[in-house]
């Protein structure tokens, strides 16, 4: 072999080595950043109790949400019930608008009689289970007097709950052009409700946390409207992942939450499932694939990823102290410091085999307190920082993530004599320190 060929061979080996070295980390990075591939315009998955995001794709992009809008309608009704402003057994008689929409067979509806009387409970179940549009408008009128005023409440509540990118234009999620010319004042005929996937997760989390009874209704696979009357009608749930339905999910208990579909929104679904104390909330916007099951196929991918790879782990128990942050200084107190502890247990969804990759992160409101100090005074926040190689999506709301650090006991203010003696001691300690520094400087 001549020298020229040797050089060419050596150069080829160098190039090959560099290529393998460079490409290997890139492959690893890609795998880390894309643990699953969700075929939808946007998606997100969170663990409910901690707000930890387990997966996210275009989650901050505002998109049409179709009938998932009814989750806000349900929230406002349940709030009104809780506040005593509306009762389950109070009755409602449809006005011309609600009657007209209820007779539109091209929309999801239970037909309502113009002179009929319907309880709030009946209208709520028709909305939550069968996504009945006229029933949702009726709820809006019951709660706010008109759908226009209800839409104002929807947007105000969205802001209050911490949503950041949203636009609610009606109580149903229908495109306004399908409201037979009755779109709420201040909205145009071409509008429909739009919310980001992340904000839908925020809404779902609040709905389940604030009014967990929603799951008692959203988990009903099928029932009847006005059973035993001339108006009896089957009401199957559009959430096919419920037990006994065509896309039933068997690894965990699916008990909600809301589907949605319009021409512009495509196929959407906010789902929730629980297993072994871990509740997962998912959102899929404009899912691709099969028209009827695509949103459930994509949700299944997220559920599988969560329940196959994560479990809830208690990072700190209630009353635990964090190494390096066991106390905080107290000015003018009988004691010069006080212990600080967690105010409740801190648990997170931890990926299998990665427990060691979670490190405590403490943020104190200030470096010291001033006596008197009451037991249970909040002094800071404890969260966990992921230090592993996998993709970390953070929390749904970083301000609310983690648990509070609070004082372990009371600290009374020291009396004037003790404070005076401390001041004198500090004064002489300062003088002595100056003398020592001066003498030390001579040698």
Curated annotation (Swiss-Prot):
One MF annotation (Gene Ontology) recorded for this entry: serine-type D-Ala-D-Ala carboxypeptidase activity
InterPro entries reported for this sequence: Beta-lactam/transpept-like, Peniciliin-bd_prot_C_sf, Peptidase_S11, Peptidase_S11_C, Peptidase_S11_C_sf, Peptidase_S11_N
Highest taxon above the source species: Bacteria
Signal peptide: 1-31
One Pfam family here: PBP5_C
Any one Gene Ontology BP term: proteolysis
EC number: 3.4.16.4
Transmembrane segments: none
Compartment list: Secreted, Cell wall; Cell membrane; Membrane raft
Annotated positions binding substrate: 258
Pathway(s) served: Cell wall biogenesis; peptidoglycan biosynthesis
Keyword tRNA processing applies: no
Active-site annotation: 67, 70, 131
GO cellular component, one term: plasma membrane
Catalytic activity annotation: Preferential cleavage: (Ac)2-L-Lys-D-Ala-|-D-Ala. Also transpeptidation of peptidyl-alanyl moieties that are N-acyl substituents of D-alanine
EC class (word): hydrolase
Similarity comment: family membership: Belongs to the peptidase S11 family.
Function: Removes C-terminal D-alanyl residues from sugar-peptide cell wall precursors.
Name of this chain's protein: D-alanyl-D-alanine carboxypeptidase DacA
Species: Bacillus subtilis (strain 168)
């Amino acid at each position: 072999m001549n020298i020229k060929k040797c050089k060419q061979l050596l150069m080829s080996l160098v190039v090959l080595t560099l290529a393998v070295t460079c490409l290997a980390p890139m492959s690893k990075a890609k795998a880390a950043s894309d643990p699953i591939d969700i075929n939808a315009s946007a998606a997100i998955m969170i663990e409910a109790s901690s707000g930890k995001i387990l997966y996210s794709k275009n989650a901050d992009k505002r998109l049409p949400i179709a009938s998932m809008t009814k989750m806000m309608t349900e929230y406002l009704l349940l709030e009104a019930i809780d506040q005593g402003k509306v009762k389950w057994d109070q009755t409602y008689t449809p006005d011309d608008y609600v009657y007209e929409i209820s007779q539109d067979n091209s929309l999801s509806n239970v037909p309502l009689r113009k002179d009929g009387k319907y309880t709030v409970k009946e209208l709520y179940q028709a909305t939550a289970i069968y996504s009945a549009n006229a029933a949702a408008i009726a709820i809006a009128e019951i709660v706010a007097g008109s759908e226009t005023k209800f839409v104002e409440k929807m947007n105000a509540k969205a802001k209050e709950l911490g949503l950041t990118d949203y636009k609610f234009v009606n109580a149903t999620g229908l495109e306004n052009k399908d409201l037979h010319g009755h779109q709420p004042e201040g909205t145009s005929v071409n509008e429909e409700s739009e919310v980001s996937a992340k904000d839908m997760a925020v809404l779902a989390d609040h709905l389940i946390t604030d009014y967990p009874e929603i799951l008692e209704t959203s988990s009903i696979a099928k029932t009847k409207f006005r059973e035993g009357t001339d108006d009896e009608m089957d009401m199957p749930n559009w959430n096919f992942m419920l037990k006994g339905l065509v896309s039933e999910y068997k690894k965990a208990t699916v008990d909600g939450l809301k589907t949605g579909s319009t021409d512009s929104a495509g196929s959407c679904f906010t789902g929730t499932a629980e297993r072994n104390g871990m509740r997962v909330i998912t959102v899929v916007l404009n899912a691709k694939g099969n028209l009827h099951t695509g949103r459930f196929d994509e949700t299944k991918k997220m559920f599988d990823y969560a329940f196959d790879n994560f479990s809830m782990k208690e990072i700190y128990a209630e009353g635990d102290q964090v190494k390096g942050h066991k106390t905080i200084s107290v000015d003018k107190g009988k004691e010069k410091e006080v212990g600080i502890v967690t105010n409740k247990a801190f648990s997170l969804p931890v990926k299998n085999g990665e427990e060691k990759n979670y490190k405590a992160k403490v943020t104190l409101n200030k470096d010291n307190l001033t006596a008197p100090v009451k037991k249970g005074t909040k002094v800071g926040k404890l969260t966990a920082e992921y230090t592993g190689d996998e993709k970390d999506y953070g929390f749904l709301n970083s301000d609310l993530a983690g648990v509070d650090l609070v004082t372990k006991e009371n600290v009374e203010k020291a009396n004037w004599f003790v404070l005076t003696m401390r001041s004198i001691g500090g004064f002489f300690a300062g003088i002595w320190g100056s003398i020592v520094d001066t003498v030390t400087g001579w040698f």
